[in-house]
């Protein structure tokens, strides 16, 4: 979450009159994250989150994101619920941006994920994948291989200002991924951005999944690979195999990975690393002046990419060939 677009108090108060969530008492911007403008609202009826959708979110995609949250919640997945305005719509316009309000979830995201957190997110991710099987809407992933090529084109001429040789590394890896990306693995609804700051816990108990603007239909095991990268590496960017085992074991109890998914996991993890390396790189090079946001380090994902390039077997992730934890 972040703040790119400021909202005046009187404008916000008028906007809230179109909802039945009480009168505005206070509000503040939320600085974490890099994608949309988010505000914590305190009204006479409680706490809510207001999101103004920015650069990478198309208004035509909002029914998918907001509808998915409602669908998942109905099937027992803890996630925010969109509020409807007095016209029955789940989004409208504020400060020239598409805007939606969701209920506030209790909990904190883990700054230093432990083994229990990794197990919790494994269980929640698998249950989300299963709950999404009958979601009727479909959204193609705009940040898969073709999207990575477009991102690279935006950053290629300046990539080496971030790290010498980065442009060549990205070009070579994108060529491998374009030639080898799997097309026959199980697909469905994925979150596509389930980082620690998008998962709330009360102690070691997971209390909710948030931030769905990258959700789409894609390879389920790719979502697993995104989480492996986001949850199971340490601050020095080394893989914590104990965390990885806990994550995979918990996921597999709910939805076992097939042999084909396991075989593809190293390549999927490379793709997951490239995806976040590129979006972070573009953001790093293009943060708007004065934005209340700290761009995330793209070089973290260079190190993770190189780790996965060196993987020779899923045993390197703490798994044996059957998908059981080694």
Swiss-Prot record:
E.C. numbers: 2.7.1.39
Protein name in the entry: Homoserine kinase
UniProt xrefs under InterPro entries: Aminoglycoside_PTrfase, Homoserine_kinase_II, Kinase-like_dom_sf, Pseudomonas-type_ThrB
Gene label: thrB
Chemical reaction(s) catalysed: L-homoserine + ATP = O-phospho-L-homoserine + ADP + H(+)
EC top class named in words: transferase
Family matches, as Gene3D superfamilies: 3.90.1200.10, Phosphorylase Kinase, domain 1
Family that this chain belongs to: Belongs to the pseudomonas-type ThrB family.
């Amino acid at each position: 979450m972040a703040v790119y677009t400021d909202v005046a108090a009187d404008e916000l108060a008028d906007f809230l009159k179109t909802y039945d969530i009480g009168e505005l008492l206070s509000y503040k911007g939320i600085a974490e994250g890099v994608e949309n403008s988010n505000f914590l609202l305190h009204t006479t009826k409680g706490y809510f989150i207001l999101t103004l959708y920015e650069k990478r979110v198309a208004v035509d995609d909002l029914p998918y994101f907001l509808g998915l949250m409602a669908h998942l919640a109905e099937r027992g997945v803890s996630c925010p619920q969109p509020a409807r305005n007095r016209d029955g719509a789940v989004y409208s316009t504020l400060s020239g941006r598409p805007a939606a309000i969701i209920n506030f979830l209790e909990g904190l995201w883990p700054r230093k994920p432990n083994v229990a957190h990794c197990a919790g997110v494994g269980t929640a991710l698998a249950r989300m994948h299963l709950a999404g099987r009958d979601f009727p809407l479909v959204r193609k992933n705009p940040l898969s291989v073709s999207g990575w090529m477009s991102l690279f084109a935006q950053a290629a001429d300046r990539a080496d200002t971030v790290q010498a040789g980065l442009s060549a590394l990205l070009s070579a890896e994108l060529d491998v991924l374009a030639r080898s990306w799997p097309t026959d693995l199980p697909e469905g609804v994925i979150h596509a951005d389930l980082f620690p700051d998008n998962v709330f816990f009360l102690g070691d108990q997971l209390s909710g999944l948030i931030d769905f603007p990258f959700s789409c239909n894609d390879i389920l095991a790719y979502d697993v690979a995104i989480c492996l990268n986001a949850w199971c590496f340490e601050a020095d960017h080394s893989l914590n195999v104990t965390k990885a085992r806990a994550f995979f074991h918990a996921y597999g109890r709910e939805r076992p990975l097939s042999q084909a998914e396991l075989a593809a996991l190293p390549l999927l993890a490379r793709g997951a690393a490239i995806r976040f390396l590129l979006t972070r790189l573009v953001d790093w090079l293009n943060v708007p002046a004065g934005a209340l946001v700290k761009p995330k380090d793209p070089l973290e994902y260079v190190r993770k990419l190189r780790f996965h390039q060196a993987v020779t077997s899923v045993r390197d992730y703490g798994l044996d060939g059957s998908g059981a934890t080694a």
